[in-house]
Each structure stands twice: as structure tokens, then as C-alpha cells.
């Protein structure tokens, strides 16, 4: 099994490279490859333990998404985010349940609602994987990422209540509402507490490697602590991620932030790649258990369910955008109707993934319609990832909603850079009359004045100054290359520790220059 895991990772790396080369979301070839491998004779069957999948994959990926989220933008878009994360989940679950009950009358209502809850939430991992290389409007990205952080909680609460109701034979909507409210509040509180405790741990550890390890463990701690008291582990992880993301500049050293980014990027790539591959690998076992069914009927059922899933999101998206503003003049004035293009993009960006698969496989043995539900979950993941995932980019470009490419840093980035440079200049100027630091301050003032002038020129877009600043930065890159080449040629003359230190300094300086040029993310 270990050899198979290494082989899957190698294949994921190849597919990710090909996906970038052919400009397709890399989640798509991963799922397709997993489905193809599922029918390769002689390969060992890969068991997908659903509880392990939720516990292993969700906490770090959700924590990282929350950590990177623009929290002020998240708060300013909280209304549409909640309308999608809660309202769209409930509406979609209801539509899918009605369609499933209509097409499969023998399916109990509880099982049909469980199916709806399984398929309702667009997946955070899938959304991030598909949107990563696209450039939709920032407002669209904020709402979609915010939705994907919270919708798993609402869908899992509805799913658990529906499963329990099916087993017990009764369904209580009041219990569902109470469970959702309690789970959300409890999860948020536990995530906040774990985040605060984690910050105390970081201060006590004061070591880069230990801090990074503790930051990874914090998400798992929040998830398991919340699940232990039947609160929402998803909300707990998101709350913990928000807390750490907001406080990272106070609790982490510069070295910790730089090295943590590399570690988290690696973790994200490995977990994201494996989860999509594992989703595809589940197809073989499901097909074997469905041999007794009429495949024409199953195909029509899968098609109808997937269409209901996609159409219901369009209906809900345009309904919540149009009806409340039609009824409230204050809302229209405070929050004008978003462009139809934005609504179309958000409606089409409803890819399903790990949560839907894990929830379907977590259904108890003997659950009514379990095999059909698992089959429909795989079909929905396949359709939304392959159809919507591959066409989302062309749709965004066709609607003309691609953020324009900017030669160099974005204006808002340069505004922040100017403020930082101005603050640094003021701090140095304050030391000009200091007997202890005056001479050194005189030397630094001119350097920081040049940085401020350069930032102002780039922010205002004045072409001559902008081009001159860019030429200076590129010349500095050439100088760094010459310095690095000298180190390589004379590496036998230098102590290994000194060589390593100088190389790190040159690498950091190069990264800073490339960021100023806008050449790195």
C-alpha cells in the first residue's frame, strides 16, 4: 500500500504539470485518472475510510483557506456568504430530495434528504483548486471562498439529522434547526478558544519548526474538540484559522511566516492531489455493487440529479439577488444589484468534492438506498468537476469578467508599499538628532526616500518613473545572479555554514525583488 501511495503522488505530480500546461483545473485530470485506475486489473483496492477522510483532509485545508482569507472582505460580504452557505444548502438539499423521491419512490424521505445534504455543499477544496489559476472579480472570489468555508457545517448538520431520522423513522425540523444553531455557536467558540491557546503556545515555543508544527496541530485540535462535544468541527477549524490569520504578524517571526508558507503549500498540494485521486478510485467498488440495477435507469437518475443540483443553484442565486432588493429600497441603496455576469459565474462555480464523497461513504451499512446514493455522489462530483470545472474559465473570459493583467504590482499593493516605506522613513528621520544613531540615520534617510519615491511612482503609474524603477529592480536581479555565480565558483573556498547563510540572503533578496516586480504570487 505504501508503494501505491508513492505511485499516486508521482502520478499526481505529472497530472498537475499537464493540467498547468494545457490550462485545465488540475482537480479534473486527478479525478479522471482515479476513475481509470479503479478498473486497472491487479491494483489493490483502496479503502476510503470516510471518517478518516473528513478528519485528515478537511482540518488542514479549511484552516489554510481561513488563514489566507481577507477577513475584512469576508465580513463586508457576510450577508451573501451566509445566504449561500446556509440558504443555498437547504434549498439545494430540498430540490435534490424531491427529484430523488420522485424518480425513486421507494426511497424514504429521510434518505432522500440525506442525499440532498450530501450533494448540497460546493466543496472548499474543489473551489480553491479550480479558482486558483483563474482571475474572476475579487468580489466573486470573496463570496465563493467564504461560502465554501461555512457550507460544509450546515450540510453536515442536516446530513446527520437526516440519517438519524431515517434510522429512527421520524424527522424533526425543530431538532434540525436547534442542532445547526448549537453546532455553529459551539464550533465557533471552541475554534476561538483553541486559536487563543495556540497563540500562547507559539509565544512559549519561540522556535520556527515548533511553531509550524503547532500551527498544523491547532486545526486538528479545534476539529476534534468540537466533534467530541457534537459541535461543528468545520466551524471550529474555520474560526481557528481566522484567529491565526488575523494574529500572524503579532505571534510569528518573519522566518516562521516565510517557512510556514512553504510547508503549508506542500501540505496543500499533497492533500488536495490525493483526495481527488481517491475520489475517482472509489468508482470500481460502487459499480460492482450496482450490477443488479438497470444502467439506463441509473444513468437517467444521475443525469436528473446532476441537472437538479446545477439548476437549483442558479434559481437560488438569482432569487436572493433579485427578490430582497425588489422588496427593500434601503437594501437596493445600500447594496445595489450585482451584475448578472457575477451571479452567473457564482452559480456555475458549484463544484462538489471531498465532503460529498466522504459523507456518502459514511452512510451506515444497510441504509436505505446507500449504493444508489454513493453512486449519485460520485456522478455529481464527476459532472460538476469535469463539466463546470473545465468550462468555468472560458465562461469567465466570455463574460469579460477576468481581472486585467497588470505589469508589475497592483495599485493597492503599491499603496500599501508606499505607506510602509513612509513609516520606515519617519522612523529613521526621528533618529537624525539622536547622538547615538544620528550618523547612521543620515546614511539611511536617502535610501528610504528613494523607496518612497519609487513606490509613489509605481502607485501613480507615471510611466518614466515606473520604467526606471522596474529597470533598477531588474538590474538588481542581474547583480544577484552574478553574486550567486561567484559563490558557486568559489564554494570550495568558503565554510559550508557561511555559504548556506549567504545563499539564503541572496534568495530572500531575489524573492523580494520579484514580488516588487509582480512576478510571484
Task: Show where each model-derived region lies.
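Transmembrane helical cores of multi-pass secondary ion antiporters/exchangers
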Residues: 1-411, 415, 419-422, 497-521
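Cytosolic C-terminal regulatory domains/tails of membrane transporters and channels
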Residues: 404-521
Amino acid at each position: 500500500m505504501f508503494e501505491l501511495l508513492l505511485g499516486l503522488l508521482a502520478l499526481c505530480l505529472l497530472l498537475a504539470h499537464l493540467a498547468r500546461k494545457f490550462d485545465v483545473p488540475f482537480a479534473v485530470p486527478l479525478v479522471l485518472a482515479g476513475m481509470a485506475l479503479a478498473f486497472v486489473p491487479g491494483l489493490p483496492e483502496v479503502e476510503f475510510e470516510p471518517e478518516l477522510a473528513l478528519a485528515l483532509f478537511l482540518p488542514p485545508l479549511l484552516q489554510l483557506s481561513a488563514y489566507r482569507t481577507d477577513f475584512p472582505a469576508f465580513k463586508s460580504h457576510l450577508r451573501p456568504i451566509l445566504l449561500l452557505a446556509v440558504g443555498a444548502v437547504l434549498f439545494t438539499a430540498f430540490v435534490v430530495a424531491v427529484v430523488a423521491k420522485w424518480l425513486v419512490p421507494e426511497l424514504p424521505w429521510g434518505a432522500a434528504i440525506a442525499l440532498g445534504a450530501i450533494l448540497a455543499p460546493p466543496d472548499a477544496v474543489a473551489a480553491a483548486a479550480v479558482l486558483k489559476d483563474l482571475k474572476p472579480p475579487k468580489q466573486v472570489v470573496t463570496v465563493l471562498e467564504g461560502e465554501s468555508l461555512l457550507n460544509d457545517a450546515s450540510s453536515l448538520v442536516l446530513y446527520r439529522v437526516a440519517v438519524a431520522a431515517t434510522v429512527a423513522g421520524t424527522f424533526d425540523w425543530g431538532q434540525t434547526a436547534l442542532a445547526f444553531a448549537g453546532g455553529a455557536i459551539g464550533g465557533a467558540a471552541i475554534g476561538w478558544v483553541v486559536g487563543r491557546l495556540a497563540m500562547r503556545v507559539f509565544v512559549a515555543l519561540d522556535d520556527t519548526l515548533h511553531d509550524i508544527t503547532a500551527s498544523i496541530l491547532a486545526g486538528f485540535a479545534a476539529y476534534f474538540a468540537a466533534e467530541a462535544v457534537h459541535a461543528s468541527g468545520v466551524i471550529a477549524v474555520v474560526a481557528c484559522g481566522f484567529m491565526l490569520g488575523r494574529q500572524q504578524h503579532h505571534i510569528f517571526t518573519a522566518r516562521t511566516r516565510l517557512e510556514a508558507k512553504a510547508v503549508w503549500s506542500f501540505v496543500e498540494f499533497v492533500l488536495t492531489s490525493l483526495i481527488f485521486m481517491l475520489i475517482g478510485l472509489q468508482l470500481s467498488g460502487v459499480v460492482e455493487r450496482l450490477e443488479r440495477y438497470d444502467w439506463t435507469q441509473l444513468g437517467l437518475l444521475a443525469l436528473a440529479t446532476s441537472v437538479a443540483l446545477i439548476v437549483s443553484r442558479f434559481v437560488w442565486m438569482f432569487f436572493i439577488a433579485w427578490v430582497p432588493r425588489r422588496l427593500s429600497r434601503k437594501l437596493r441603496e445600500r447594496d445595489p444589484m450585482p451584475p448578472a455576469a457575477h451571479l452567473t459565474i457564482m452559480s456555475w462555480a458549484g463544484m462538489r468534492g471531498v465532503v460529498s464523497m466522504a459523507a456518502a461513504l459514511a452512510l451506515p451499512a444497510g441504509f436505505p438506498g446507500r449504493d444508489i446514493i454513493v453512486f449519485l455522489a460520485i456522478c455529481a462530483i464527476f459532472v460538476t468537476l469535469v463539466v463546470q470545472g473545465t468550462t468555468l474559465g472560458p465562461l469567465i473570459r466570455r463574460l469579460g469578467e477576468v481581472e486585467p493583467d497588470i505589469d508589475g504590482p497592483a495599485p493597492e499593493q503599491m499603496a500599501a508599499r508606499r505607506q510602509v516605506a513612509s513609516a520606515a522613513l519617519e522612523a529613521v528621520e526621528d533618529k537624525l538628532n539622536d547622538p547615538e544613531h544620528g550618523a547612521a540615520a543620515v546614511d539611511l534617510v536617502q535610501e528610504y526616500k528613494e523607496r518612497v519615491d519609487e513606490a509613489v511612482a509605481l502607485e501613480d503609474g507615471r510611466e518614466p518613473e515606473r520604467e526606471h524603477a522596474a529597470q533598477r529592480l531588474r538590474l538588481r536581479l542581474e547583480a544577484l545572479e552574478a553574486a550567486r555565480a561567484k559563490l558557486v565558483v568559489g564554494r570550495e573556498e568558503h565554510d559550508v555554514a557561511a555559504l548556506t547563510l549567504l545563499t539564503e540572503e541572496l534568495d530572500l533578496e531575489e524573492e523580494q525583488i520579484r514580488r516588487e516586480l509582480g512576478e510571484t504570487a
